[in-house]
Amino acid sequence: MRRIGIDVGGTNTDAVLIEEGKVVRAVKAPTSEDVTSGILDSLQRLGATGVLASGRIDGVMIGTTHFINAVVQRRHLTKVAALRLGMPASASLPPFCDWPEDLAELVRGGVWMVEGGHEYDGRPFMPLDEAAVIKAAHEMKAAGLRSVGISSIFSPLDPSHEKRAAELVGEVMPGASITCSSELGRIGLLERENAGLLNAALADLARDTIAAFERAIRNSGIAAPLFITQNDGTVAEAGQARRLPVYSFASGATNSMRGAAYLSGLADAMVIDVGGTTTDVGQLRNGFPREANSVVKVGGVRTLFRMPDLLSIGLGGGSHVVLEPLKVGPLSVGYRLLKEGIAFGGSQLTTTDVAVASGVLDLGDKRKVGHLDSATCRKVFAKAASMAEEAIDRMKTEAGDVPLIAVGGGAFLIPEQLPGVSRVIHVEHGDCANAVGAAIAQVSGECDQIFKDMTRRDAIDAARTIANDRAVAAGADRRTLATIDSEDMPLAYLPGNSVRVRVRVVGDVAAG
């Protein structure tokens, strides 16, 4: 298969062509403020090398910062109607109750709370008040709202009330964008509801962004399906990503970790991804990033997404360097490195300037950094290594030395030996590991649900079937699906041999 992987970073937009498992060509383009033109630029640079003319492209995989930027920067968000099924319970904590006020003001289009929902064991808490749902939908329509987030108590156990409410709202508001929380989160009403509301707020941006990506691909003369990378290191076809954009919040660092695993051939290792501004440290398990088990805040909003467990520090190739007293980062010149770095005619001393002065990098004009002696350079590199060492130690989950894969454009800051590390692996094409990770990504499906009145084996099989179906819906080839994570927990306080099962599967992208 021939695939193009693109990853948008804070400094560069990287693009690679992978054919039959090998990196054929890699290019970098400056990240543009609107992101999309940077992607088009990277595709054009890749095409200019001539490698795209020799055969069909099977897919273009893009990792984008559009959606997380919209939430963090409070821009391009749509007003959302929040419909919660749970009355008379849950009234004391209405939708948006734990949001930052500035973000809530932007997104909150109205709140409607009606009877419905289920108990913790799946029994109906209250019958769904369909008349109240229809009345709410008419009020939403009259208010000019076109995006709706629906949540229901314990909907991951039984999503039937959410689905029925979505049908009723769709009949009153044809063409509206409707998000059901049961599609997004796990057990935990507020966090799951928040995920649904954020997703609904991104509906218009997701539609416009993915349409722009598809235009960029067409304008580059490439006839290939578009896939968007997700938080867990997998991809979803464009239609699925358009419907569930929140799954693509934190794909950049995840892509780098997947790319590191692919380029090194290691499935279990620590990974340090040194970019232009920040360094991300995480751990690979079975070739995928270890997931965070805690609540994840996105733009100040509590959610329960599938997110990688990462530690970020202010160290990168564009980090500011202060010599007296010695300080590296957290400020960075970012994508302005080629203008502001001393080696390129600017006035700001950066880690890249130090690397040029010491001969580690052959960039810019070495004469401009001739005032940096070898002792000074060694001190700066030692400081950077100390920062990396501390971050790695904080992310390790077991005693002893572990292998470390160093990737990213700033990987020159990581020395060949570090305390607590058995070996440091610098891989070919490591500076574009993020784009490689996007290009080789598979498709995933997950189920996290409580089952009752069945054996443990039947519950696990049922969860696996649901996860498989979700993966296929996201664009996976059913024949290639494999389970990469499975856990079950008997719930003694619930009737009917209740067991909570979480299963995650991955598979290759379906051909065609």
Locations of the language-model features?
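N-terminally biased helix-coil "hinge/interface" segments that flank
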Residues: M1-G512
